Amino acid sequence: MKTEQLFIENTPAVLYSEPSDTLWLFVHGQFGCKEEALPFAEIVSPDAQVLSIDLPNHGTRQNRDEEFAPWTAAPELTRVMAYARAHWRATNVRATSIGAYFARLAFAAPEKALFVSPIVDMERLICDRICAAGITEQILRERGMYPAREGDMLSWDYLCWVRAHPAKDWY
């Protein structure tokens, strides 16, 4: 499989397969990395190329002072999709979990989209996690941050951002 490492602005990326007019942008989920796209590239090649990036604080970008949050990931994906649309005739998306959510924030629906375990309603997910933590939104608002059962933190600012920036409806 032909593999090319590149940067789109400052974003590390990998491009799989021989040149084609068709591209699949592969967006990994939490704890993922750009190299996860290889098995998918093996399936869609030679009819399409696959472009994958490391989202903030993932893959080759781990341990940097970057936040894995929608306000950092979505603008980056907007830039990557603009690059893709400038270089390929057809651009599609294959995204996993929170990667699907970030993609829906970042750009309008592509011709084709394949989602694996997508987060389709981030606000609902956060509210369910608030309930599971045994607190109310008021408590989260007052404290700002609260430990979630899963080991990460619930954030009032994150919830407010999600409410102020609804994801685009692709379906």
Q: Where on the chain are the PLM-derived regions?
A:
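Short beta-strand element of the alpha/beta-hydrolase
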Residues: 21-29
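The alpha/beta-hydrolase serine catalytic core
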Residues: 110-171
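Short beta-strand immediately N-terminal to the catalytic nucleophile in serine-hydrolase-like folds
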Residues: 90-95, 116
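A short loop-to-beta-strand scaffold at the N-terminal edge of the catalytic core in hydrolase folds
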Residues: 7-17
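Conserved alpha/beta-hydrolase
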Residues: 44-63
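Gly/Ala-rich beta-loop-alpha elbow adjacent to hydrolase catalytic centers
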Residues: 94-103
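The serine-hydrolase catalytic nucleophile loop
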Residues: 30-42
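Alpha/beta-hydrolase active-site loop
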Residues: 36, 67-86
